[in-house]
Curated annotation (Swiss-Prot):
Official protein name in the record: Uncharacterized protein SMPP11
Tissue occurrence: Nacreous layer of shell.
Amino acid sequence: TSFTLYMR
């Protein structure tokens, strides 16, 4: 899962 991309 792209957590960092989501949390921008």
